[in-house]
Design a protein with these regions (language model features):
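Extracytoplasmic
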Residues: 12-47, 65, 155, 241-246, ...
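Helix-to-loop junctions at the C-terminal end of transmembrane segments
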Residues: 64-76, 273-285, 370-371
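Hydrophobic core of transmembrane alpha-helices in multi-pass small-molecule transporters
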Residues: 22, 91, 102-118, 144, ...
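Helix-loop-helix hairpin linking two adjacent transmembrane segments in secondary transporters
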Residues: 143-193
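Structural signature of the two symmetry-related core transmembrane helices
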Residues: 79-93, 288-303
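Conserved MFS/SLC helix-loop-helix module at the cytosolic interface between two early adjacent transmembrane helices
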Residues: 63-101
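Extracytoplasmic gate region of multi-pass secondary transporters
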Residues: 29-37, 216-272, 362
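Intracellular juxtamembrane helix-capping segments at the cytosolic ends
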Residues: 39, 117-131, 326-339
C-alpha cells in the first residue's frame, strides 16, 4: 500500500510545479519588460542602462546553474526552490523602493540567484527523478506547457496594474502573489523520489541502480560538448531575434506594431509545438528530434534574412516559433535520455551555464555582430550556418559510452 500511495506522487509534484513555474516566469522574467518604460520615465535612466541590470541577472543565473544542479542532485529541490522563492519575494520588495541605478543592478545581481533556484532547471531536476523514460517526456511537457502561458497571463495583468497603480505598487502586488502561491507549494509539495520504492511511472528503481553518468564522466563525452555548444547558439539565436526583430523589420518597411505582433506569435507558436515534440522523439529518437529543432531554427532564420525579398514572413514565424518552443523541452528530455537521471541536475546545470548565458549575451552580442558585419542579414546568415552545423553535430555524434555508470 505505501507503494500505491507513492505511485502517483510524481504527478503531484508536476502539478505543483505547473503552478509555481507559471507564476515565477510570469513575475520574475516577464515582469521586467513591463516595468521598463515606467522606470525609464520616473528614474530618468536610459533604456540601455536599465536593461543592463536584467542582463546582469541573466548572467548570474547562468553562472549559478551548475551549483544549483549539484545541490539538487545531493539534497533535492524542496529547500532550494523554497529559499529561492523567499529570496525573490524579498528582492521584489526592495526593487519597489529602488531610486538609483547601482541599487537596481544590485537587486538584479541577487535576483539572478533567485532565478537559478526557481525557474526551469531546478523544476526539471525535481521532476526527472520521479519518472522512467516513457513518462518523463510527458511530465516535462506538462510543466513547459503550463509555464508557456506565463507571458499570456501575467504581462497584460502587470501592464493593467502599472497603468492603474504605478510600477512600485505593482511590484508589491506581485511580491504578494509570488509569496502566497510559490512558497507553500515548494515547501509542502516538493520531495525527493523514494529510495528503494517504485516510482511514479510504476517501475521498480532501487536508488543505487538508477542509471546515469556523473557530470565528470559526461563532460568526457563528445555528445555533452556538442549539446552544450548547440544549445548555446540556439538560445543566442532565439534571444537575438526577440530583441532585434523590431528594429530589423522596421528598417525594411514593416511597421513596429506588425513587428511586435510577430514577436507575440513567435511566442504563441511555442505551446502547440511542444505538444508534438514527444511523439516525434518517440518515433525518431531524442537526438534526431533535437537535431531537427536546430535545422528548423536555421530555416526560420534564413527566411528572416530574406525578409526584404519574401511576400510574407508567416512561414518564418511558424517555423522559428515552433523550433524555439521545442528547444526548451528538448534540452531537458535529451539530457535525461542520453546521460540518465541519476546526476541530471548537475549535467543539466552545466549545459544551462552556456544556454542561459547566451540569453544574457545575445542582445549585446547580436548588436556587436551587426556593426562588425555591416548589417543584420550577415548576422542571420552566420547564425544559420552555425545552427546547421549544430544540427548535424547533434545527429552524428556517438553516444554509445553514455548512460551506463
Amino acid at each position: 500500500m505505501p507503494s500505491l500511495a507513492r505511485l502517483d506522487y510524481g504527478w503531484v509534484v508536476v502539478a505543483g510545479l505547473c503552478v509555481t513555474e507559471t507564476v515565477s516566469w510570469g513575475i520574475l522574467y516577464y515582469g521586467f519588460p513591463v516595468m521598463l518604460r515606467p522606470m525609464e520615465a520616473e528614474l530618468g535612466f536610459s533604456r540601455v542602462e536599465l536593461t543592463g541590470a536584467f542582463s546582469v541577472g541573466m548572467g548570474v543565473a547562468a553562472l549559478a546553474a551548475l551549483p544549483v544542479g549539484r545541490w539538487i542532485d545531493r539534497h533535492g529541490a524542496r529547500a532550494l526552490m523554497t529559499l529561492g522563492s523567499c529570496l525573490a519575494v524579498g528582492l521584489l520588495l526592495v526593487w519597489s523602493r529602488v531610486e538609483s541605478l547601482p541599487a537596481l543592478y544590485a537587486v538584479w545581481c541577487a535576483m539572478g540567484l533567485a532565478l537559478a533556484a526557481t525557474l526551469y532547471e531546478p523544476a526539471f531536476a525535481a521532476v526527472v527523478g520521479w519518472f522512467a523514460t516513457g513518462h518523463r517526456d510527458r511530465a516535462l511537457l506538462t510543466v513547459t506547457l503550463a509555464a508557456g502561458f506565463a507571458s499570456t497571463i501575467f504581462m497584460p495583468t502587470e501592464a493593467w496594474l502599472v497603468e492603474r497603480f504605478g510600477w512600485r505598487t505593482t511590484l508589491l502586488v506581485l511580491a504578494t502573489i509570488l509569496a502566497v502561491v510559490t512558497i507553500p507549494i515548494h515547501a509542502l509539495v516538493l520531495r525527493r523520489p523514494p529510495r528503494g520504492e517504485s516510482r511514479a511511472a510504476g517501475v521498480e528503481w532501487v536508488e543505487s541502480r538508477v542509471p546515469g553518468l556523473t557530470l565528470g564522466a559526461a563532460a568526457r563525452t563528445g555528445v555533452f560538448w556538442v549539446l552544450a555548444v548547440a544549445f548555446f547558439f540556439g538560445n543566442f539565436t532565439t534571444n537575438s531575434v526577440t530583441v532585434h526583430l523590431i528594429p530589423y523589420l522596421s528598417d525594411r518597411g514593416y511597421t513596429p506594431t506588425l513587428a511586435a505582433v510577430m514577436i507575440g506569435w513567435l511566442g504563441a507558436m511555442q505551446v502547440p509545438a511542444r505538444l508534438v515534440f514527444a511523439p516525434i522523439a518517440v518515433r525518431f529518437g531524442h537526438r534526431a528530434a533535437t537535431a531537427a529543432i536546430f535545422f528548423g531554427q536555421a530555416l526560420g532564420l534564413a527566411q528572416l534574412a530574406l525578409a526584404a525579398r519574401l511576400p510574407t514572413l508567416v512561414p518564418m514565424v511558424v517555423v522559428l516559433g515552433a523550433a524555439n518552443g521545442m528547444s526548451t523541452l528538448a534540452r531537458a528530455t535529451t539530457i535525461a535520455e542520453i546521460f540518465g537521471p541519476r546526476h541530471y541536475g548537475s549535467i543539466s546545470g552545466a549545459v544551462a551555464l552556456g544556454a542561459n548565458g547566451a540569453r544574457a549575451l545575445a542582445p549585446v552580442g547580436a548588436a556587436f555582430l551587426q556593426v562588425a558585419l555591416g548589417g543584420y542579414e550577415p548576422v542571420f546568415w552566420l547564425l544559420t550556418a552555425v545552427l546547421v552545423v549544430a544540427g548535424f553535430g547533434v545527429f552524428a555524434v556517438r553516444t554509445r559510452e553514455t548512460h551506463r555508470e
